[in-house]
């Protein structure tokens, strides 16, 4: 397809109409590169994709895709063994997450028979291990502390050191308030300093980092915090080094998968592009045209896409029709009709919806040529006629029977008689070459050519004689006629002058009467057709309204079912919580053994009435909802005991799940994690007691870490931990108390000695913590 036609018809402006619908940079790049195609199967595939997307919107009301940055350059850098920065890794993380979401979305689609999009969905690949590792990068482009143990250690030390510096400086603010110009802690060159009055600079020993512009304030780093600030500076350098190491490791993880990730990114961008095409079609009442294989071109109620309130027109370019000649005066909309045909064909061949009604057809041209407007070349000193003729000669040399040719004011710019003769000769050459042509002209001689010549048809633009203005309605089959006499009469020209003028053109009066009759018949036919279309539109509106009501009803029904299920679940949860509270109180106040409490709990559960709910439609629906939320590979999760995010990577034969949490792999049962919804992620509060379940030959086992706790806090957590361990039938537990001053260790020992359910306890082996940990046997 020649590029000149794209400029002449302003095709790039048409493409810009789709920009507001795009969410990904990849789809924007695809739109920028979009050009008309010349192969029918490729065009058909594009149309099928839009039809598939329409089905998705009908069934699901939406097709969610997040904004994605282009990762093309980042992937190229990976291929060159370069390391990516945090923002580049975050962009790739979003692509991985969006790929996983799209795979899950596709697996949940029902009642849709795809023609093309299924292949795109099925070519998407998941990377659960990578997703799990990349949870260490949050959405703000920050590395979480759990990205590595070393980073966590550095940041913990950094936090402690900064807290100590703040505390020392806060104390000095109180003690040295009279020496300070402001009661605040300032920062200079990354160091925490105090703003000291210049007259008292010798009263506070330390390092001077800055002096105010007025010279009245000196910013001093007190000697008491110099060492700590140096430690903070070193820790920040260590933090940057460790972050760089982690980014290098993440880059290495991505390198083997560059090709697949690039393919995923392209698919996501293309799906976004198809979504944009559908939304453009829906908002502009456009349609997907059929593709004819016999050069037939039918446009029903076609509109110019770049006009604000375009008039819709019908155009029928049958397979045996070679040329349509639009005659009549200027300013009637002839050029707009010419451009509308060209743009509709360009849009259709680019795989875009056409601004026309259903039933429209396009054909596939290898080239579209146009001579529109004044393309006079001042540099070449050519006249308007010469400029047009040079262009027309070029078109005639290049056009073939697989081309569409558009001429605006063919033969204009020279002697009318010679111009008309040239126009007819050019049209005749194109007709004999079987090249489809639409031409506009104001030469009356071409009316006769259109009437007398086979496979050529006249057309004109309607003119309202009452208002003396064009209506821009296209009248195919009706040649244009001059309205000069009617206009002159209405503008007040003397009747005898108008009569004399008519007598002078008596030879053309019969032709004009025939044209007038044809116009009247065309108008009547159009009125009837408009009425039929109005009825059709009413029927369509009714059908849409019924469908919309049905969809709303289905949606509301599903919401009610979900609400009923949630309410029922809340009631059950409330009852179970109350029973747990009662049992806890009993355990605190009695001599009941843990296994007796568990038996009692089971008896309480048995009190619930056994009702056959197999035929209950509401609960059956609820079960389906619950089943639809079963964990799947690639799901994001919250590990309950840690409060940290991870990603499911695989399911074991025994039903347990493997998950990637930062750089750590974990094996979890389903009750040890909760799913994070894609569109409604819930914030999870980190629990203060970290319990890590392990497999042990003596039965379930748990661990409690009391290091860094205050004595009272540690004893409360120990008491709660032992209670929970007994209720969960733990056979053996580990308590990590550290060595330190020995206060917490002694408190743990005293507590265990007096607890009636502790069978035995002893320090851990030397290789498992030694005297810093105690192993407890419960019973």
UniProtKB/Swiss-Prot annotation:
InterPro entries the UniProt entry points to: DNA_mismatch_repair_MutS_C, DNA_mismatch_repair_MutS_core, DNA_mismatch_repair_MutS_sf, MSSS, MutS, MutS2, P-loop_NTPase, Smr_dom
Smr domain residues: 704-779
Gene Ontology MF terms: ATP binding; ATP hydrolysis activity; ATP-dependent DNA damage sensor activity; endonuclease activity; mismatched DNA binding; ribosomal large subunit binding; rRNA binding
Sorted UniProt keywords: ATP-binding, DNA-binding, Endonuclease, Hydrolase, Nuclease, Nucleotide-binding, RNA-binding, rRNA-binding
SMART domains tied to this protein: MUTSac, MUTSd, SMR
Entry-linked HAMAP family: MutS2 (MF_00092)
Protein name according to UniProt: Endonuclease MutS2
């Amino acid at each position: 397809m020649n590029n000149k036609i794209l400029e002449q018809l302003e095709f790039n402006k048409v493409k810009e109409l789709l920009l507001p619908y795009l969410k990904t940079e990849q789809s924007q790049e695809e739109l920028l590169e979009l050009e008309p195609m010349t192969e029918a199967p490729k065009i058909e595939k594009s149309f099928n994709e839009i039809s598939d997307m329409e089905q998705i919107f009908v069934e699901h009301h939406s097709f969610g895709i997040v904004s994605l940055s282009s990762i093309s350059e980042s992937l190229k850098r990976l291929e060159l063994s370069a390391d990516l920065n945090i923002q580049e890794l975050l962009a790739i993380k979003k692509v991985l997450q969006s790929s996983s979401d799209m795979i899950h979305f596709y697996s949940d689609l029902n009642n849709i028979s795809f023609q093309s999009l299924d292949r795109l969905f099925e070519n998407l690949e998941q990377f659960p291990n990578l997703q799990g590792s990349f949870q260490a990068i949050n959405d703000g482009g920050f590395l979480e502390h759990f990205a590595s143990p070393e980073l966590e250690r550095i940041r913990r030390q950094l936090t402690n050191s900064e807290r100590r510096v703040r505390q020392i400086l806060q104390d000095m603010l109180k003690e040295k308030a009279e020496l300070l110009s402001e009661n605040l802690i300032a920062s200079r060159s990354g160091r925490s300093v105090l703003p000291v009055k210049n007259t008292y600079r010798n009263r506070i020993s330390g390092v001077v980092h800055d002096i105010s512009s007025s010279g009245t304030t000196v910013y001093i780093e007190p000697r008491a915090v110099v060492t700590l600030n140096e430690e903070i500076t070193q820790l920040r350098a260590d933090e940057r080094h460790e972050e760089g190491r982690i980014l290098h490791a993440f880059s290495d993880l991505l390198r083997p998968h560059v090709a697949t990730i690039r393919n995923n990114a392209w698919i996501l961008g293309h799906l976004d592009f198809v979504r944009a095409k559908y939304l453009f079609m829906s908002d502009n009442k456009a349609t997907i045209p059929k593709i004819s294989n016999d050069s037939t071109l039918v446009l029903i109620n076609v509109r110019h896409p770049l006009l604000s309130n375009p008039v819709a027109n019908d155009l029928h370019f049958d397979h045996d029709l070679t040329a349509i000649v639009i005659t009549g005066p200027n300013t009637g909309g002839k050029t707009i009709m010419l451009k509308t045909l060209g743009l509709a064909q360009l849009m259709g061949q680019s795989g875009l919806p056409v601004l026309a009604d259903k039933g429209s057809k396009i054909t596939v041209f290898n080239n579209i040529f146009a001579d529109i407007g004044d393309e006079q070349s001042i540099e070449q000193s050519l006249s308007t006629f010469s400029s047009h003729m040079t262009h027309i000669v070029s078109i005639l040399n290049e056009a073939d029977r697989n081309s569409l040719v558009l001429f605006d004011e063919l033969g204009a710019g020279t002697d009318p008689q010679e111009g008309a003769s040239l126009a007819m000769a050019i049209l005749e050459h194109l007709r004999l070459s079987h090249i489809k042509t639409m031409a506009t002209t104001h030469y009356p001689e071409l009316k006769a050519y259109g009437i007398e010549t086979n496979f050529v048809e006249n057309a004109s633009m309607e003119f309202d004689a009452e208002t003396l203005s064009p209506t821009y309605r296209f009248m195919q089959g009706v040649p244009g006629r001059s309205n000069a006499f009617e206009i002159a009469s209405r503008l007040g020209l003397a009747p005898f002058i108008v009569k004399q003028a008519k007598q002078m053109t008596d030879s053309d009066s019969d032709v004009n009467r025939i044209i007038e009759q044809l116009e009247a018949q065309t108008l009547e036919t159009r009125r009837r057709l408009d009425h039929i279309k109005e009825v059709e539109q009413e029927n369509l509106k009714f059908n849409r309204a019924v469908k919309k009501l049905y969809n709303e009803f289905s949606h509301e029904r599903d919401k009610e079912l979900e609400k009923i299920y949630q309410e029922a679940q809340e009631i059950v949860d409330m009852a179970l919580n109350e029973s747990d509270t009662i049992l806890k109180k009993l355990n605190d106040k009695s001599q009941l053994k843990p296994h007796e409490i568990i038996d009692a709990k089971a008896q309480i559960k048995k009190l619930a009435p056994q009702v056959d709910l197999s035929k209950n439609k509401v609960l059956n629906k609820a079960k389906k909802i619950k089943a639809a939320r079963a964990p799947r590979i690639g799901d994001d999760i919250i590990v309950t005991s840690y409060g940290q995010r991870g990603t499911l990577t695989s399911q074991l034969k025994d039903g347990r799940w493997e998950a990637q949490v930062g750089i750590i792999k974990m094996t979890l049962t389903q009750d040890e994690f909760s799913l994070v919804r894609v569109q409604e992620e819930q914030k999870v509060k980190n629990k203060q007691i970290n319990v890590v379940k392990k497999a042990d030959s003596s039965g379930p086992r748990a661990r409690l870490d009391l290091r860094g706790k205050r004595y009272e806090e540690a004893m409360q957590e120990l008491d709660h931990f032992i209670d929970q361990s007994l209720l969960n039938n733990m056979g053996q537990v580990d308590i990590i108390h550290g060595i330190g001053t020995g206060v917490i260790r002694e408190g743990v020992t005293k507590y265990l000695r007096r607890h009636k359910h502790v069978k035995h306890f002893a320090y851990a082996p030397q290789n498992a913590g030694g005297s810093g940990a105690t192993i407890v046997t419960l019973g």
